[in-house]
Amino acid sequence: MHIWQEYFSTSFTGAPAGFLSAAHLLQLGIGYLCATLLAVTLGRSRRHRTEQEKRLVLRYAAVFQLFFAALKIAADCIDAGSPAPMLLSMPFYLCSIMFVALPLAAFGKSRVARVMTDFVAIFGVLAAVAGAAGAAYIYKIYPALHIHTLECLLTHVASGFAALYIWISHLATFRREDVPITAGVLGAFMILAVLSNALLASTPYPTNYMFFSRSDGTPFLLFEKLFGAQSILYALSTALAMWLWWGVAGALCSRLSHRADHAQTSPSPYRQQE
């Protein structure tokens, strides 16, 4: 019972870790270091493997991510004695879209896998940085060693790992015909977030999906200070920031990917001399 109370329930007795505290920064440092080393090592070693072999790594990352997400949801439901907390855990945040995008990139077929791979490459690092480093709400409430803080860290870092691995292994394609689809995926989840926030606003479980109602210590805090929480200008600014990231990061990823492909297919000048 002690283990359950301290590490899984909301009736813990430990002190909150604190946002950007030593414990928070230590967890971030270890998580980012491990994810980066793994992504670089596996990405370089599998760069010239088949697409199927490259996607095997994404499958492990997807299972890892979903395991901890499911564990946290299960703990919340058991603690509440009700499945109602699941309403707060739908994948309608920019970072938790990865709970859908990463498995589809890993296990999907043909164009679905290709488009979702591009999506993860664009948004994975943003999820890792903004979601784990900017998780003020989580670390202000829960101890460093709690399912909520650990799930937040591990699932976000897994997204960053997946994005780095995709870049390094040259798994993404960034085809022009897929651009409208990646934009459509983001737009669809935004619509779902707005609908969910509106439908659950007057219930005991009001949601703040996509942080459209208020910030959570993420970079959107600047918009909240400028326009105020629950305002239309705040919500629009938050949405525009996501679209801006999609445009800038997508263009950069596409350029780097095409440059890498060109370098691989260009003949060596030394061979030409021979």
Residues of each region from the PLM?
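N-terminal topogenic module of multi-pass integral membrane proteins
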Residues: 1-56
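Membrane-interface transmembrane-helix boundary segments in multi-pass integral membrane proteins
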Residues: 12-31, 179-188, 200-246
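Structural signature of hydrophobic alpha-helical transmembrane segments
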Residues: 27-31, 83-96, 120-122
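Hydrophobic core of alpha-helical transmembrane segments in multi-pass integral membrane proteins
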Residues: 27-45, 64-71, 187-194, 239-251
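Alpha-helical transmembrane segments in multipass membrane proteins, preferentially the mid-helix core
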Residues: 37-42, 101-105, 158-177
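Membrane-interface helix-boundary motifs at transmembrane edges
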Residues: 44-58, 107-116, 169-180
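Juxtamembrane "helix-exit" motif on the non-cytosolic side of transmembrane helices
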Residues: 70-82, 133-143
